[in-house]
């Protein structure tokens, strides 16, 4: 923990407290002990010490909450996490709204809290929407009071009471004879109870708000009178008509009145939270909360489209998806088409029912499964679109045509005129359809639409997005068990309208439509069904899972908080200390979002050494909360009070703010929630803000986590939350915090010390100096002095409109100039995307805005809102070998990677999965073993080059490079039981039979009796057999079942029962026989082309319970289960299943031996040159994937191999260098060809007397640098290691095993250390045979690995996809996606050329977060009621176009160079554009020149005049200089220039906004540079910037830096 002192931040005494004591909870004065106490224990300790102060109210609440928890436990229940949060709010008497899904316990919470408060003598009122709910709630409460002997009077009124009962209940209500009252909202409308309530719980706000006066009634129930309600409504009206200042004045008066009223607590609960009208805002004015209607944007729907539009397609998808669908017919086809579709489906045996406003029958039958599909018209207020909420039943939706609006074109034009939105008169009478289309596009600014003519009138058709969202949302609902998955299939009837729908879905909901053939429907249906099963099973158990957790997310700005909250619907809002706190439900998190308002603390001014306490060689910053009065910042309380006093004496308005209030808000919410997310910006400043928040929230909540996102989009927020759930949360980086601390202290020390000197000299106490601003001021002065120097300048106008100018001393009297012209084709690459400095430079020039304005605009815009080909094999942590595409899609997390410290292969974690559309050249690298790797040019591989291991990009790999290859390493592989293999392969339609003595079956039988309601349970119990799929579903341990199961078989007539067999070496050897030369047809497995009797004998031994027979040249065995296992393992077709390589080594080796015995070969080949035989060991296949996977595995157990191809057949050849290892590990499992191997082995060994070497290492150049003591080489000779021969041999290779021995005798050196690391490591090397560039258009994939940042790809070590953020031009994969989607939406896919602009350790560039151009942004802003200025639009347009251009192909131009000999100058530009490329989006910054075809040009005009030697700087040019010279940071560029302007050191010229130093600025600079050059020089400033960076990287001790800075400051005299 970093030592810091926070003034006035002790939660108890409001005194100063250290960061260490904040971790304990209170300061030393309050409690001497240093133990961390539980909250109630802390209260007890403070009471004992008699120091309990500010925490007293919290202690009361904590104690009451404990009481409530115990009360609920005594009733026999446990509070859910979310209920605990609600309880704490009620106990604080804070009113609020609950917007959560049905079933998470909100109604029951209302009951529990009412009983608890009633027990304490308080009066409670539960308001429900229906009589049924009133009855059920009354029965529940009555049952609880009776069972637990609670003396609580409960009264319930409802319409089903008898006349006598109604009279009695009304009398009791009239006489206040109750503690808890329960009625419908309808009762409240007609009968207003007279007494005041302490707690009112409204369950279902929609029913309450049917009568808007009920809002007033609820407020009166709480103790507010008519007068105060009317005053509150007056404020609402003033705000509505724009009289904000008047409203604020009245609000201040109202707040004082409310503070004197002891009112009750109101909870408004709803699953939808729809609220209408102005009166509902009374809750905001009087109770500090607003009702939200969250979850309408919460959807997990796969949006699919099919361009085949027909009834037949509806039938096809219903048959595929099954029961539980809705068919929505586009409104323009009407009910008649819906009836036609109903009839068609019924005729095809689909149980379908049409639902519409006049016929709503069918809902219950659909719920019960008697109807499979409902049909309705896609209308926003249709009964199916809005009235259906069956998450357990509705699985998918089919849209027959795109939901659309039909608008009469004439009426639409007239309505625009009436609203004043159409300035010119538009007449469509007598126009052709083509002309009308042009009017709609150009005048009405509608891009995607359809035009129809009905009854001589044109209809405009545009997509009805809200209806689509609402209707498709029926398939994905938030429930107590989480958000369900749904599918939506749109049958496209109008392509133009569909394009508009796609855009809207992308912009508004960040959802991308997928073409039907891009979706794995089998997986989708499986996930949909899993979610429904979860609801079914969960509700059957009758217990609400504790899924919904409450989390406080703290961001920096209120804008950002609001934007994030609005991603998920209209949030509920609470006002705490006059600040908005937003609340939304996002799946299983109840997210509460608030803002810190940026930095909360700053250094004090009047304590320590300029705000730093120095003691015991420590430098401890003393912080206090930032205070502002009318925008002016203070840290000293006395200064603040003095200013307020002065303003009040002058009668001026005082707008005061203390950032401490933000911490108090955070602390209050922290006490309520389960956890806190620190979501400040991920940079140095954001890290310090986050650290301050975290440390000050600690006394109230210890579950604090860091989350981060580099763009404000729904996708990014959900991704950050998902990362946290997976355990990938970030932590606050203390090094960054230390960097910020030092930067601020240094700025304070130098600023205060030098500023005081300036005050003394110039007698102006507003002057300031700083280490960065002073050099920058110097540049502006230096430029100004140069500008004053005048030089002669000649400007010529030549024929053909050629202009040229040059500094020219002499007269120029020529009438003609000689020219040389070159014209050639030239590719012009786009500029990279903007960084902070380039944006400031460009935007200041273009728009004349200040850097400060542009930074502010960019911030507000922000707040709104390397890879491999898919066939690359990656080795997983359990040994499985799968394609990277499958790994990314399945998000497999455990992979093998290389620990670079000791070169050992270890299990690591994939933390990010990348899938990117790529169109460009790939590097195809072919290795000497003929394995191949295809990668994007920047994908890095581990290469031995220049005697070092280096990461080299694929584009820079050369022939004869050596790439690191994992070799002979250990993997923890595990056996798999038969039943678990069946589960893995999804072969679950098999029956398991148990004998009479089975104890496990008794457990199964008990489960069946208790949980299975259908008659099939008797069949299971009677026959003692159960389908495997149910045993899996019921979560029984399959390994335990396998121990006692008697038989297994398929429920097909004639299928033989077989005993459960072991998947041991014998089974996997058999599998190898089939892999080599077998075939599978139905249940029969045939093995051919081998000694048949031998095979038959092997099968007899492996499967003694099955008959096998010889037929022709084949041995046949039949069993449907074994046949399906082999089929799904890929033994004959498809992919060889990667699970094989997760089995124990002996099993895989037996499989490979079986393969050799059917389709392998052992033969001796005579080498005439060496006069010796080589042993050829080879496997063959037409399937490359089989041999590649086996080869990768063989390398892992130390067997070298190469891959060859001849015609269509592949061969895997085992290297003779690995003969001994092959004999030891594979050959012992051979049966049929064992003798052939042994004979070959004996011959080879006899002729090759030297000991076999497993592998050779290409390290001779490093080896040659070793030194040996005298006599040691002789010792090695005795061991038959002649290293002198190694020096002579031409090869670079050295035998690994011999090198190990040699290294024991070598002298110690870095070279020895390097070689020892390699020989003892888990790698060898493979030579690069060939490198090619190949075109590619498709997806590429990558992984981000947590620790080692590499993985095994196609048998070599491959670097992962790293992703860091800083100010740079780097484009992330998300950025590339935005560009790709924009170009695709605008039919510019051919222009795409993704570029990463890679920068090591870099942040991302400035870019848009949505594929939305400026016109679309304006439309988006209108629809979402977001107001931005024209300058915002300009800056966005600039950023957008520059970014999209950076991801497009080069422009190709006919380039012209005109060399003017007489002036020795060139004019350059383009004559013609051959291919526009990126210039289609962004300006081509080249002159357009005429084609010149002669050798001289006439001078038409000439001028010789005096001009300034250099132009003055503008703000953008100064920013560029700061970047180039390493002064300042992106976040401070604009601030530095603003400070120079504010201090009066610099002014801007009126005409061109150029920077001009003032007399004061020049004098201040001269004084500083003459007296303190060592402190404010450019070099010293740059040096300090580098030191700060080192602190942030953990390379330098920040205390030592502060010590040095302190000494430097003390030198100022």
From Swiss-Prot:
Residues 733-1613 form the Topo IA-type catalytic domain. It holds the Pfam family zf_Rg. Disulfide bonds: none annotated. Binds 1 zinc ion per subunit. Residues 87-291 form the Helicase ATP-binding domain. GO terms for cellular component: cytoplasm. Mg(2+) binds at residues 556, 681. It is an enzyme of class 5 (isomerase). Its main location: cytoplasm. Zn(2+) binds at residues 10, 13, 27, 30. The active site is at 1363 (o-(5'-phospho-dna)-tyrosine intermediate). Its cofactor is Zn(2+); Mg(2+). Monomer. In the N-terminal section; belongs to the DEAD box helicase family. DDVD subfamily. This is Reverse gyrase. It comes from Methanocaldococcus jannaschii (strain ATCC 43067 / DSM 2661 / JAL-1 / JCM 10045 / NBRC 100440). The gene is rgy.
């Amino acid at each position: 923990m970093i030592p810091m002192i926070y003034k006035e931040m002790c939660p108890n005494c409001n005194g100063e407290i250290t960061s260490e004591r904040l971790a304990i909870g209170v300061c030393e004065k309050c409690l001497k002990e240093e133990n961390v106490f539980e909250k109630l224990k802390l209260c007890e300790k403070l009471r004992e010490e008699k120091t309990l102060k500010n925490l007293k109210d919290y202690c009361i609440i904590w104690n009451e909450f404990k009481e409530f928890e115990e009360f609920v436990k005594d009733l026999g229940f446990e509070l859910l996490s979310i209920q605990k949060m609600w309880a704490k709010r009620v106990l604080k008497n804070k009113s609020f709204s609950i917007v959560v899904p049905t079933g998470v316990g909100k109604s029951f919470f209302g009951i529990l809290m009412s009983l608890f408060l009633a027990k304490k003598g308080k009066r409670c009122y539960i308001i429900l929407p229906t009589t049924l709910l009133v009855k059920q709630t009354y029965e529940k409460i009555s049952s609880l009071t009776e069972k637990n002997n609670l003396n609580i009077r409960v009264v319930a009124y409802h319409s089903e009471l008898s006349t006598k009962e109604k009279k009695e209940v009304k009398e009791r209500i009239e006489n206040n004879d109750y503690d808890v009252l329960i009625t419908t909202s309808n009762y409240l409308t007609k009968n207003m109870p007279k007494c005041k309530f302490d707690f009112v719980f409204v369950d279902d706000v929609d029913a309450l708000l049917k009568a808007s006066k009920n809002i007033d009634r609820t407020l009166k129930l709480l103790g507010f009178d008519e007068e105060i309600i009317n005053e509150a409504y007056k404020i609402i009206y003033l705000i509505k008509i724009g009289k904000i200042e008047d409203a604020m004045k009245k609000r201040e008066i109202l707040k004082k009145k409310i503070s004197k009223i002891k009112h009750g607590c109101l909870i408004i609960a709803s699953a939808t939270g729809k609220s209408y009208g102005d009166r509902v805002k009374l809750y905001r004015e009087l109770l500090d909360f607003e009702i939200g209607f969250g979850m309408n944007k919460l959807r997990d729907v796969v949006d699919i489209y099919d361009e085949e539009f027909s009834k037949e397609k509806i039938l096809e998808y219903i048959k595929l998806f099954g029961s539980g669908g809705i068919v929505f017919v586009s409104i323009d086809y009407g009910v008649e088409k819906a009836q036609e579709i109903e009839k068609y489906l019924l005729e095809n045996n689909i149980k379908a029912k049409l639902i519409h406003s006049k016929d709503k029958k069918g809902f219950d039958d659909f719920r019960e499964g008697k109807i499979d599909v409902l049909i309705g018209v896609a209308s926003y207020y249709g009964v199916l679109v809005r009235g259906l909420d069956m998450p357990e039943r509705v699985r998918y939706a089919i849209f027959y045509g795109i939901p659309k609006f039909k608008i009469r074109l004439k009426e639409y034009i007239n309505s625009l005129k009436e609203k004043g939105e159409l300035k010119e008169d538009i007449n469509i009478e007598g126009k052709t359809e083509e002309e009308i289309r042009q009017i709609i596009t150009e005048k009405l600014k509608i891009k995607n639409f359809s035009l129809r003519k009905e009854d001589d009138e044109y209809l405009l058709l545009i997509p009805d997005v809200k209806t689509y969202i609402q209707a498709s949302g029926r398939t994905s609902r938030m429930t107590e068990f989480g958000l369900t998955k749904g599918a939506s299939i749109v049958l496209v009837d109008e392509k133009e309208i569909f394009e508009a729908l796609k855009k809207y879905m992308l912009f508004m909901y960040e959802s991308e439509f997928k073409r039907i053939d891009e979706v794995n429907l089998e997986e989708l249906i499986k996930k949909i069904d899993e979610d429904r099963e979860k609801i079914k099973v969960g509700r059957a158990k009758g217990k609400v899972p504790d899924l919904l957790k409450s989390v406080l997310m703290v961001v920096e700005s209120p804008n950002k908080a609001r934007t994030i909250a609005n991603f998920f619907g209209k949030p509920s809002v609470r006002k705490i200390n006059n600040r908005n706190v937003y609340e939304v439900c996002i799946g299983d998190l109840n997210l509460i979002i608030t803002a810190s308002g940026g930095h909360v603390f700053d250094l004090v001014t009047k304590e320590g050494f300029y705000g730093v306490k120095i003691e015991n060689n420590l430098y401890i910053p003393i912080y206090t909360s930032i205070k502002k009065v009318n925008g002016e910042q203070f840290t000293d309380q006395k200064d603040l009070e003095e200013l307020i006093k002065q303003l009040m004496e002058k009668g001026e308005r005082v707008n005061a703010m203390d950032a401490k209030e933000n911490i108090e808000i955070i602390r209050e919410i922290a006490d309520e929630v389960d956890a806190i997310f620190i979501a400040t910006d991920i940079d140095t400043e954001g890290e310090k803000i986050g650290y301050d928040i975290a440390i000050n929230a600690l006394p109230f909540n210890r579950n604090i986590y860091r989350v981060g996102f580099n763009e404000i989009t729904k996708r990014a927020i959900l991704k950050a939350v998902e990362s946290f759930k997976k355990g990938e949360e970030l932590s606050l980086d203390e090094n960054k915090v230390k960097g910020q601390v030092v930067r601020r202290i240094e700025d304070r020390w130098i600023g205060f010390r030098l500023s005081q000197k300036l005050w003394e000299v110039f007698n102006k106490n507003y002057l300031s100096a700083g280490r960065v601003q002073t050099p920058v001021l110097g540049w502006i002065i230096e430029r100004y002095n140069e500008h004053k120097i005048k030089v002669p300048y000649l400007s010529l106008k030549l024929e053909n409109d050629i202009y040229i100018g040059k500094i020219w001393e002499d007269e120029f009297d020529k009438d003609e100039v000689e020219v040389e012209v070159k014209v050639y084709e030239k590719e012009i690459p786009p500029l990279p995307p903007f960084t902070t400095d380039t944006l400031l430079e460009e935007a200041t020039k273009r728009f004349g805005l200040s850097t400060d304005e542009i930074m502010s605009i960019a911030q507000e815009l922000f707040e709104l809102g390397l890879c491999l080909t898919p066939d690359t094999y990656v080795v997983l942590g359990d040994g499985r070998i799968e394609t990277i595409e499958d790994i990314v899609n399945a998000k497999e997390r455990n992979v093998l990677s290389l620990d670079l410290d000791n070169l050992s292969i270890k299990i690591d974690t994939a933390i990010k999965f990348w899938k990117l559309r790529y169109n460009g050249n790939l590097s195809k690298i072919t290795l000497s073993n003929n394995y191949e790797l295809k990668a994007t040019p920047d994908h890095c591989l581990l290469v031995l080059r220049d005697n070092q291991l280096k990461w080299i990009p694929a584009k820079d790999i050369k022939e004869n490079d050596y790439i690191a290859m994992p070799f002979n390493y250990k993997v923890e592989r595990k056996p798999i039981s038969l039943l678990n293999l069946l589960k893995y392969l999804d072969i679950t339609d098999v029956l398991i039979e148990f004998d009479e003595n089975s104890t496990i079956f008794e457990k199964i039988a008990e489960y069946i009796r208790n949980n299975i309601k259908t008659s099939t349970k008797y069949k299971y119990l009677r026959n003692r057999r159960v389908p495997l799929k149910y045993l899996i579903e019921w979560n029984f341990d399959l390994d335990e079942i396998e121990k006692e199961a008697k038989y297994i078989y398929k429920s097909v007539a004639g299928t033989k029962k077989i005993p459960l067999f072991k998947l041991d070496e014998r089974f996997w050897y058999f599998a190898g026989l089939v892999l080599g030369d077998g075939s599978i047809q139905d249940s029969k497995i045939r093995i051919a082309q081998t000694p048949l009797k031998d095979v038959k004998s092997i099968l007899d031994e492996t499967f003694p319970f099955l008959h096998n027979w010889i037929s022709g040249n084949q041995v046949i065995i039949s069993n449907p289960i074994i046949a399906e296992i082999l089929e799904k393992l890929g033994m004959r077709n498809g992919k060889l299943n990667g699970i094989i390589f997760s089995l124990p080594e002996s099993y895989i080796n037996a499989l490979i031996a079986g393969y050799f015995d059917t389709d392998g070969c052992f033969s001796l080949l005579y080498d005439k040159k060496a006069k010796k035989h080589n042993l050829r060991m080879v496997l063959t296949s037409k399937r490359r994937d089989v041999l590649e996977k086996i080869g990768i595995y063989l390398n892992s157990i130390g067997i070298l191999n190469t891959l060859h191809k001849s015609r269509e057949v592949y061969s895997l050849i085992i290297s003779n260098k690995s003969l001994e290892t092959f004999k030891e590990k594979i050959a012992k499992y051979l049966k049929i060809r064992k003798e052939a191997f042994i004979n070959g082995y004996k011959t080879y060994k006899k002729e090759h007397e030297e000991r076999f070497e497993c592998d050779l290492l290409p390290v001779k150049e490093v080896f040659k640098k070793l030194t040996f003591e005298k006599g040691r080489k002789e010792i090695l000779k005795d061991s038959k290691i002649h290293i002198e021969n190694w020096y002579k041999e031409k090869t670079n290779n050295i035998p690994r095993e011999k090198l190990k021995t040699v290294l024991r005798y070598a002298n110690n050196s870095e070279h020895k250390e390097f070689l020892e690391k390699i020989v003892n490591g888990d790698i060898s090397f493979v030579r690069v045979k060939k490198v090619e560039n190949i075109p590619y258009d498709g997806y590429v994939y990558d992984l981000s690995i947590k620790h080692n940042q590499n993985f095994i790809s196609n048998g070599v070590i491959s670097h992962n996809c790293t992703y860091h953020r800083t100010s740079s031009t780097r484009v992330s994969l998300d950025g590339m996606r935005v560009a790709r989607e924009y170009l695709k939406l605008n039919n510019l896919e051919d222009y795409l050329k993704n570029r990463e602009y890679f920068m090591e350790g870099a942040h991302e560039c400035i870019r848009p977060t949505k594929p939305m151009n400026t016109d679309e942004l304006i439309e988006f802003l209108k629809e979402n009621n977001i107001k931005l200025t024209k300058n915002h639009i300009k800056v966005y347009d600039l950023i957008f176009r520059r970014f999209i251009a950076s991801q497009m192909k080069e422009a190709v131009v006919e380039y012209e160079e005109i060399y003017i000999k007489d002036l020795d100058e060139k004019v350059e530009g383009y004559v013609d554009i051959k291919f526009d490329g990126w210039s289609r989006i962004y300006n081509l910054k080249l002159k357009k020149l005429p084609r010149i075809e002669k050798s001289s040009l006439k001078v038409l005009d000439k001028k010789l005049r005096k001009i300034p030697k250099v132009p003055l700087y503008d703000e953008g040019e100064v920013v560029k200089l700061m970047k180039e010279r390493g002064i300042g940071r992106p976040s401070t560029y604009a601030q530095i220039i603003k400070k120079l302007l504010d201090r009066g050191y610099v002014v801007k010229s009126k005409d061109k906004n150029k920077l001009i130093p003032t007399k004061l600025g020049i004098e201040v600079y001269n004084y500083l540079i003459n007296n303190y050059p060592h402190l404010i020089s450019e070099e010293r400033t740059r040096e300090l910037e580098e030191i700060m960076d080192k602190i942030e990287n953990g390379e330098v001790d920040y205390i030592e830096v502060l010590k040095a800075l302190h000494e430097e400051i003390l030198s100022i005299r």
